[in-house]
Amino acid sequence: MSAPANFNGQTPKIDPANAAMLLIDHQSGLFQTVKDMPMTELRANATTLAKVATLAKIPVITTASVPQGPNGPLIPEIHEAAPHAQYVARKGEINAWDNPEFVAAVKATGKKQLIIAGTITSVCMAFPSIAAVHDGYQVFAVIDASGTYSKMAQEITLARVVQAGVVPMDTAAVCSEIQRTWNRDDAVQFAEAYSAVFPHYQLLIESYAKAQAVVNNHEQLVSQRK
């Protein structure tokens, strides 16, 4: 297996201060072709990445492939979750990295790490990820915030990007590596973000909130009532 590229022997992990997020071609039409994961999960994961990038003040760049055609518009949740996101219109290029304005926007962030997700995985995520590695970036590909037309296509693409030096991750791992600690003022917002990725986590949040309320309000336990 190939080693992660451009890390110079260092541990390949996300540095929030040196990272930019590229959310590529998360479009309503393309989402209808996704078969390797539930569309609702893909949509939630992509939106969660945008939310966490906003919390961590990570630059976000979005783009779409011929959005006036059958590929459809970007899903609106991404820019709603990341109002600071910059949209770059392409001129038909399939690989976003072939668009000079897109690459210029990435370079303008001054960041050396790129967190990339895109639909479809084998094209919209893989092509720019491999190209960015070639240009010297440290690239993290978020596989479960990217979707494609078959499980086989996902597996082949994962092997290809790893061979090229890309670091594959899932959404929860990306969020955790960005968050780093629960000892931060926005910890509650991060917890809410996780609940969108794995909804059962919301049950833990609710149980904890109730337990805290019992303590803080000096509620009498049912077992103590006469």
Please tell me what each predicted stretch does.
Residues 2-92, 108, 138, 155-162, ...:
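Active-site acidic carboxylates
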Residues 71-78, 102-103, 128-130:
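Distinct, well-ordered alpha-helical segments
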Residues 45-48, 101, 124-127:
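Well-ordered alpha-helical segments embedded in enzymatic catalytic cores
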Residues 106-112:
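Glycine-rich phosphate-binding loop signature in dinucleotide/nucleotide-binding domains
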Residues 113-171:
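A contiguous pocket-lining binding segment that forms or flanks enzyme active sites
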Residues 91-104:
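Short phosphate-binding loop-to-helix
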